[in-house]
């Protein structure tokens, strides 16, 4: 089933910081892997949170024709690791199981089938041997894999990821990207904030280029070009033919 996110004239302002985002317009048709890219402080994470309905915004955001708050059951969200309390005394298995509780009614216990899905997700991210380990003892890459396993058991149609590759090892990045591609094959729509430009063409089907507004959006090959990147990064991005991109 095709999915659709519509962003119309969206803006975000704060009392001490007006126009964090203004006049944002884009359409995301899924299944797809879409990257939100732009320089530091450009409003990438703010846009993601606005689409989720986590912060107040002007304009209109629709997910499958509904407001975000009406379709929260379709969405899984992984925030930046810097915003998560690693000291909370919980194991990998318990953390992943929290994702399954969103499928249940209040105070409804997890069933054997639920726990089987939890264990299968932990196995898929390669952490079965560590399932009883406290999350505070994990590396950044291991913990990010735990968060993706938690998304798996939610069985959401939309996956929103805020900087999932920051501070992780290459193995974890490979595991995570394999899972993300599998999600797309299953018909899911993934929207991901990303500051690293080196793998934009490899990772994303579509790109939203942000600098306090949506400068351009669409297929990666149409947006990730010198014309738009110069507008956003001030000419500091070098794009060699067939090579990597550097800011």
Model-assigned labels for residue ranges:
Residues 194-195:
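H-loop/switch region of ABC-family ATPase nucleotide-binding domains
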Residues 208, 212-222:
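Conserved switch/coupling elements of ABC/ABC-like ATPase nucleotide-binding domains
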Residues 59-71:
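Conserved ABC transporter NBD signature motif
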Residues 159-163:
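Catalytic Walker B motif of ABC-type/P-loop ATPase nucleotide-binding domains
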Residues 1-23, 85:
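A short, flexible loop at the N-terminus of ABC-type nucleotide-binding domains that lies
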Residues 134-138, 142:
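Conserved ABC ATPase signature
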Residues 111-130:
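Conserved ABC ATPase "signature" region
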